[in-house]
Regions:
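SAM/dcSAM-binding transferase cores
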Residues: 1-34, 227-286
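The AdoMet/dcAdoMet-binding core of the Class I SAM-like
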Residues: 2-4, 53-182, 194-201, 279
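Conserved Class I S-adenosyl-L-methionine
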Residues: 172-173, 198-219, 233
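Rossmann-like AdoMet
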Residues: 1-63, 67-69, 95
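Acidic/polar loop patches that form or flank catalytic/metal-binding clefts of enzymes
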Residues: 187, 213-218, 242-245
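Glycine- and acidic
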Residues: 50, 189-190
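Conserved beta-strand signature within the Rossmann-like core of class I S-adenosyl-L-methionine
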Residues: 182-189
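Short proline/glycine-enriched turn/loop segments at secondary-structure junctions
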Residues: 220-224
């Protein structure tokens, strides 16, 4: 008998993956955690029945949420990552030799433990000496920080359950205070395609625009995420994601990527008309 994993993207749409083995299943204090082994996408991590990553396409998300700000900010030394218990963002960040310290705040220790065991290619750099892992609520952690970070990356789950508070105006305001005077905030912005996801995307962007002087949106195409069309938010106190992009400086680093390039960086900020329409009432002009 064939085993399939299915995730509903809307009440009328579901995405299914054939499963070879169900490797892990446990409910933590925060959420249901499962690992599946699939023939097409390799190992798959789901939280509360929602795909968080697959071995085959996680590089797209992790490269785009990490390297876009790193190619813009001229001197990132201190980074805060909220979420990211799978380790993919950390794997990308530690390739920057001049980065001095990373605080990673993950509410669920079991996510980190499971990913270290079952997703070693993603969680392979969680022992880097520059990394400090804090197992606590990101909402509470950020409230006590003042002008400490050059970059904050919010690699949260979807805007419900444990990750719900990471999309609020209060949270983005606290991120602003935690950033240095030229700091950048990056967050995953959900998909703009299905109406329910689009509404969450619009709310999150509105809250960011009200907190930061520079707020833009960029995109990537991730096969296993709802609709495959995914947005990220770029919010900054000083730097513009295109005007301040330093292609030469970033390319000289020689960081190997499978998705991100500085050419793609520029194109990613040119969003489709339907997304412009969704965000036009809250987007600022620069």
């Amino acid at each position: 008998m064939e085993l399939w994993f299915s995730e509903f993207h809307t009440p009328d749409v579901k995405h299914s993956l054939r499963v070879d083995r169900h490797l892990y299943s446990k409910k933590s204090d925060y959420q249901q955690i499962d690992i599946y082994d699939t023939p097409e996408f390799g190992k798959v991590l789901t939280l509360d029945g929602n795909v968080m990553l697959t071995e085959r396409d996680e590089f797209i998300y992790d490269e785009m949420i990490t390297h876009v700000p790193m190619a813009v900010h001229p001197n990132v030394q201190d980074v805060l990552v909220i979420g990211a218990g799978d380790g993919g963002v950390i794997r990308e960040l530690v390739q920057y030799s001049d980065l001095q310290h990373i605080d990673m705040v993950e509410v669920d220790p079991l996510v980190v433990e499971v990913c270290k065991k079952y997703l070693p290619k993603t969680a392979c750099r969680l022992e880097d000496p520059r990394l400090t892992i804090h197992y606590e609520d990101g909402l509470k952690f950020i409230r006590s920080r003042q002008e400490e970070y050059d970059l904050i990356i919010v690699d949260s789950t979807d805007p419900f359950g444990p990750g719900e508070g990471l999309f609020t105006r209060e949270f983005y305001g606290n991120c602003y205070k935690a950033l240095k005077e030229d700091g950048i905030l990056i967050n995953q912005h959900e998909s703009p395609f299905y109406p329910g996801d689009a509404a969450a995307c619009q709310r999150a962007h509105k809250n960011i625009v009200e907190s930061f002087p520079i707020s833009k949106v960029y995109q990537a195409h991730i096969p296993t995420y709802p609709s495959g069309h995914w947005l990220f938010g770029f919010a900054s106190k000083k730097y513009h994601p295109l005007k301040d992009l330093d292609e030469t400086r970033w390319n000289m680093r020689g960081i190997p990527c499978r998705y991100y390039t500085t050419t793609l960086h520029k194109g990613a900020f040119y969003i489709p008309a339907y997304v412009e329409e969704l965000l036009k009432h809250v987007e600022k002009e620069y």
